């Protein structure tokens, strides 16, 4: 399915940590060995754990590698332990991408850095051969997909906490097609259902003033990356806490192969 070859590269995840003024480096090396039926991914050159909750875990690291590889191989390859054994991942303990070492925090191990890392793997496969992989996509959880909490006056001031997913968009272009609008990030792959504006307003004390496709936000190229979202919403006669952790404001998602 894949040509023999080796690709490697570094992407940067933006951060306010003073140790990484250019961003946290995300590095991976991929070695495709069709003769032996193996794909080897080396992550040992990634930096040590950082004092943030974005450190990845062994499980999210393995899942990202398997997901990106199986996406490139296609749907006819079964998603099973036999296929997983053909993808050999080398990581180290105490790395920001790999096995965390106490007291490293991993509360956001499935989003921010995970999104950047999974996108990076897809982009590396795009370097291997035309028609493979994808460009970089959404990183983190934008304000349009906030976790909201508070008390709901409509329901007897009961406490609530929930995540609403409105405008979790910006799917990257692939080697064969335009980006899928509701893809979300590389770590969700379009598998998360989008929240209804009307239902969200009924369930929570919020008003959604605007939700629209952001103008001129697509990625240009042979195939086009899908656009992002513009959203405006606010609390409705109640105190509401909105929490989100977006990324890529300073380091936007990149194209591949000249896109």
Regions found by a protein language model. Give the residues of each.
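Glycine/proline-enriched, intrinsically flexible loops and inter-domain linkers
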Residues: 1-259
């Amino acid at each position: 399915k894949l040509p023999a070859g080796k690709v490697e590269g570094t992407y940067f995840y933006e951060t306010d940590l003073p140790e990484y003024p250019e961003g946290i480096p995300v590095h991976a090396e991929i070695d495709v060995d069709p003769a032996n039926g193996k794909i080897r991914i080396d992550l040992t050159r990634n930096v040590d754990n950082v004092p943030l909750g974005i450190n990845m875990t062994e499980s999210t690291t393995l899942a990202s590698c398997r997901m990106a590889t199986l996406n490139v191989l296609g749907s006819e390859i079964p998603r099973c332990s036999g296929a997983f054994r053909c993808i050999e991942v080398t990581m180290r303990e105490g790395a920001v991408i790999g096995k965390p070492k106490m007291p490293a925090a991993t509360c956001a191990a499935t989003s921010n850095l995970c999104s950047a890392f999974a996108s990076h793997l897809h982009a590396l496969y795009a370097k291997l051969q035309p028609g493979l992989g994808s460009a970089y996509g959404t990183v983190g959880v934008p304000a349009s997909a906030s976790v909201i909490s508070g008390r709901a006056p409509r329901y007897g001031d009961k406490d609530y906490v929930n995540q609403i997913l409105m405008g979790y968009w910006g799917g990257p272009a692939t080697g064969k097609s335009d980006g899928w609008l509701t893809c979300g990030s590389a770590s969700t792959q379009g598998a998360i259902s989008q929240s209804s504006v009307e239902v969200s307003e009924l369930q929570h004390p919020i008003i959604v003033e605007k939700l629209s496709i952001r103008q001129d936000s697509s990625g240009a190229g042979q195939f086009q990356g899908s656009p992002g979202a513009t959203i405006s919403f606010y609390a409705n006669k109640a105190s509401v806490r909105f929490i989100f952790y977006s990324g890529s404001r300073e380091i936007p998602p990149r194209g591949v192969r000249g896109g």
